[in-house]
Amino acid sequence: MGRKPSPRAQELPEEEARTCCGCRFPLLLALLQLALGIAVTVLGFLMASISPSLLVRDTPFWAGSIVCVVAYLGLFMLCVSYQVDERTCVQFSMKVFYFLLSALGLMVCMLAVAFAAHHYSLLAQFTCETSLDSCQCKLPSSEPLSRAFVYRDVTDCTSVTGTFKLFLIIQMVLNLVCGLVCLLACFVMWKHRYQVFYVGVGLRSLMASDGQLPKA
């Protein structure tokens, strides 16, 4: 009869599977979510400070705030009570909640990218001029009563056509990367859940077949 491996030897492969260069891979995703969420939030408030007439959808600090909440939950779960094979209802509930919030973060980031891309496409066509303490922009049109977009409290239109346009590009890039990180977090949570399930089924069937073998 072969010697059974010790419980410590059985735990080593499982611990190695949870780590990546000494750090748990889901933990890296949560840290990335936190860094990107803070960057998107700060940049959103900077964009809002350019003009009070900007809509909330054009300054997506709300997207960064949601991703920060997701990251805080992920850090708490991964640093305190994370187990690949959840053993309590609390661990399972936290993993499901983190999965759902990451999916929400993905949708919100993609929505922020769409809003920023739409506003950027408008700015690329605008013809702007300074009027008193505002910047008035119009789309090129042959109609004399074409719609005008007014950015209040702007003394120089270059802050709209230059600085704000650059902020929109950065927001699109940051939110796109943030959405991809949230998607990867959803995939990791799903993979851990169902990979552990099928591995557990395989181990039980293997143990059952070993138990049916005749003893030497």
From Swiss-Prot:
Where, per UniProt, does this protein localize?
Answer: Cell membrane; Cell membrane, Sarcolemma; Postsynaptic cell membrane
Q: Which PANTHER family match?
A: SARCOSPAN
Can you supply one Gene Ontology CC term for this chain's record?
plasma membrane
Major place of residence: membrane
Q: Which InterPro entries match?
A: CD20-like, Sarcospan
- Indicate what this protein is called per its UniProt record: Sarcospan
As for membrane topology, the entry says: Multi-pass membrane protein
* Residue ranges annotated as Extracellular topological domain: 48-59, 117-166
Q: Which GO terms describe its molecular function?
A: protein-containing complex binding
Record keywords: Cell membrane, Membrane, Postsynaptic cell membrane, Synapse, Transmembrane, Transmembrane helix
What function is annotated for this protein?
A: Component of the dystrophin-glycoprotein complex (DGC), a complex that spans the muscle plasma membrane and forms a link between the F-actin cytoskeleton and the extracellular matrix. Preferentially associates with the sarcoglycan subcomplex of the DGC.
Question: TM segments?
Answer: 27-47, 60-80, 96-116, 167-187
| Cytoplasmic domain ranges by topology | 1-26, 81-95, 188-216
